Amino acid sequence: MDAKKLKILAVDDDMINLKLLKSMLMKSPNVSAIVEAKNGADAIGILKSQDDIDIILLDILMPVMGGIEMLKVIRADDSLRQLPVIVLTTDETKKGEALECGANGFLMKPIREKDVLSKIAQLTI
């Protein structure tokens, strides 16, 4: 039986980072689609309107609503709390806070393709 193809929500305010992440993810045969959001508020709107997101890749430092705040909203919402979230950041000091707020994984930027694909596989199988 074939593995389910994943629909990933990538949240980052840096369009270059989003483009690089999308390029890495689309190389995987297990990814069907990548939905992009530029901040946590936009991402929450997407999650409320699309119930088929399988995993979230989330930057921490963003305007409007940052990653930690978005994590808190997700984990407080019965319809969203089960979604796996991988936090992506350049600030290693945010790891403890992110995990405490419900992140399922943590990767340091710059992201390596094999690391992000491995972490996604761990959390979605």
Residue ranges and their predicted role:
Residues 36-45, 66-67:
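Helix N-cap/capping motif at the beta->alpha junctions
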Residues 5-17, 21-25, 56:
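Conserved acidic segment of CheY-like receiver
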Residues 62:
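Receiver (REC) domain active-site loop signature in two-component systems and cognate sites
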Residues 86-88:
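Hydrophobic/aromatic residues positioned on beta-strands within the core alpha/beta folds
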Residues 51-57:
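Active-site beta3 strand of CheY-like receiver
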Residues 109:
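A Lys-centered signature of the CheY-like receiver
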Residues 45, 68-81:
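Short amphipathic alpha-helix used as the core "switch/output" element in two-component signaling
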Residues 69, 91-105, 115-118:
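Alpha4 helix (beta4-alpha4-beta5 surface) of REC/receiver domains from two-component response regulators
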